[in-house]
């Protein structure tokens, strides 16, 4: 899952996937913006069946790859 999400982020942000590590701060390092987040949410819904509501839209859930993976795992269980 992590590599798929990383690949999606790299592709949509025109970033080198090697620069995106598990703890890379996606927003603070300018890799991600609000449009990128919307695209990611759609990707997670389509590929992992994760439904996101307004209370989920906090930076802690999407701060880095580790946080995104944890978020998906929580939502799927």
Per-segment meaning from a language model:
Residues 1-18, 70-77:
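Thiotemplate assembly-line natural product biosynthesis machinery
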Residues 34-41, 65, 69:
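Amphipathic alpha-helical interaction surfaces in cytosolic regulatory modules
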Residues 13-31, 50-58:
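Phosphopantetheine carrier-protein modules
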Residues 53-76:
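C-terminal structural segments of small proteins and small subunits
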Residues 1, 23, 61-64:
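Short, conserved alpha-helical segments within structured domains
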């Amino acid at each position: 899952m992590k590599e798929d999400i990383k690949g999606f982020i790299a592709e949509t942000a025109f970033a080198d996937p090697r620069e995106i590590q598990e703890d890379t701060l996606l927003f603070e390092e300018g890799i991600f913006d609000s449009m990128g987040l919307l695209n990611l949410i759609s990707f997670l819904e389509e590929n992992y069946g994760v439904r996101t509501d307004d209370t989920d839209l906090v930076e802690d859930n999407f701060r880095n790859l580790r946080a995104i993976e944890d978020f998906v795992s929580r939502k799927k269980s």
